[in-house]
Amino acid sequence: MSIHSASPIIRRKSRKIWVGNVPVGGDAPIAVQSMTNTETCDVAATVAQIRRLEDAGADIVRVSVPDMDAAEAFGKIKQQVNVPLVADIHFDYRIALRVAELGVDCLRINPGNIGREDRVKAVVDAARERNIPIRIGVNAGSLEKDLQKKYGEPTPEALLESAMRHVDHLDKLDFQNFKVSVKASDVFMAVAAYRLLARQIEQPLHLGITEAGGLRSGTVKSAVGLGMLLAEGIGDTIRISLAADPVEEIKVGFDILKSLHLRSRGINFIACPSCSRQNFDVVKTMNELEGRLEDLLVPMDVAVIGCVVNGPGEAKEAHVGLTGGTPNLVYIDGKPSQKLTNDNLVDELERLIRQKAAEKAEADASLIARG
């Protein structure tokens, strides 16, 4: 099944909300988001990072707003970027009220630490007045004290109870413009909690494995946990939490969605791990191609196979395929196109991929124009 094949996954039906100009839930594509790790009060640095995230394809960006100074900085940041911004609020509900005045696109509050119900009501009233959605963000590391006492330790049931407590509160306030997350650093706990929650409510679900780890370990945990849920049709937005450059979170997020045929963006590489049969350096070729072609957004399959054992079969299924041989053979749309030697192999392959991407983009645009 290639990247342009339809996904067999039947997604959970959920209510559609809007985060700025981005639809979330319903029949909307699964949104990929990240979070800045700059000092929010450093407006220039935060804006620069958000723009990098936009360039990487981020649909939504979350920004931590720990105090009133950060709230004022948030307002300045909002004026300088195009992507919808979520304000991450903890402890002081008045910060949420201020960023609502400054044009925030979504408010993320943690029910375990935002305070009394009257404070939650004040935030809801401000959100309702300005049509701002709220994300109820439940986290295993910050459950309410009474739930910690009741369950003794974080459990899927504790996460669900925390979430439903605040869902019920919003229901009583007749506020339905919200999404929910129930995150944990343990994959099985998070997956179980999301499964329970998905059966209870119709609101969109924001998926994440919190504090997943560094680039490698966090990618693996997130791919396993989110992959399980997404394959079951659960999830409307995702965030890959990595102790790394936030841009990597966007890349990994799209790679997970591409692997499940839930969303297509950029090149889907098919490459062999290489062995002594290879007729060119597959690893070096792949590393160079991935770096050079990061800017391409057109959904494409590109196969890079080092020998003739699996090469022709994989290459014929790709938009552009390279099979190792003497000389190497390039396939375009499944048909043999030209032979390449190892001299300037990457340069020529990049040229052919970009040429095919331009043709495909033009054809896709023409198809859309015809309706």
Swiss-Prot record:
| Pathway noted in the entry | Isoprenoid biosynthesis; isopentenyl diphosphate biosynthesis via DXP pathway; isopentenyl diphosphate from 1-deoxy-D-xylulose 5-phosphate: step 5/6
* Cofactor, how bound (note): Binds 1 [4Fe-4S] cluster.
EC class name? oxidoreductase
Tell me which UniProt keywords the record has, alphabetically: 4Fe-4S, Iron, Iron-sulfur, Isoprene biosynthesis, Metal-binding, Oxidoreductase
**Which residues participate in [4Fe-4S] cluster binding?**
272, 275, 307, 314
Query: Which one of the record's GO molecular function terms can you name?
Result: 4-hydroxy-3-methylbut-2-en-1-yl diphosphate synthase activity (ferredoxin)
What is the required cofactor set for this protein? [4Fe-4S] cluster
Task: Fetch the PANTHER family from UniProt.
Answer: 4-HYDROXY-3-METHYLBUT-2-EN-1-YL DIPHOSPHATE SYNTHASE, 4-HYDROXY-3-METHYLBUT-2-EN-1-YL DIPHOSPHATE SYNTHASE (FERREDOXIN), CHLOROPLASTIC
NCBIfam families, sorted: ispG_gcpE, PRK00366.1
Q: What is this protein called?
A: 4-hydroxy-3-methylbut-2-en-1-yl diphosphate synthase (flavodoxin)
* Native species: Pseudomonas aeruginosa (strain ATCC 15692 / DSM 22644 / CIP 104116 / JCM 14847 / LMG 12228 / 1C / PRS 101 / PAO1)
Q: Gene name, please?
A: ispG
